């Protein structure tokens, strides 16, 4: 199916690029700074249930999580469009890709500003 192939290709491209960017930010903090924390307490105690993301300051693991999972989300979106609306595969994937990049950029900016995800 075209949507699955296109979603897989764009998922790998966008997901890899954004994961690399967020991983570099995480890695630089591990060496020269406070790790994945930005502001707030430097502990995972009291973090968000199941994920452990900081609730007192920014956490660079949040945008990294969303960037990594673009690789799985876009092929699924493409497959759904293949089944539900094959004529809208390209437009649907463009919208999903744009939304994904926006979510990663917004959560990255939020983390760098020292604001918690929740």
Located regions from the model:
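Membrane-water interface at transmembrane helix exits
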Residues: 22, 26, 78-81, 106-110
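Final/C-terminal transmembrane alpha-helix of multipass membrane proteins
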Residues: 16-17, 94-112
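Interfacial helix-loop-helix junctions of multi-pass membrane proteins
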Residues: 29-33, 107-118
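Interfacial segments of alpha-helical transmembrane regions
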Residues: 1-18, 89-97
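Membrane-interfacial alpha-helical segments at the cytosolic side of multi-pass membrane proteins
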Residues: 72-85
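Polytopic transmembrane helical bundles with strong interfacial aromatic enrichment
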Residues: 10-35
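Membrane-interfacial catalytic/cofactor-binding modules of polytopic membrane enzymes
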Residues: 26-70
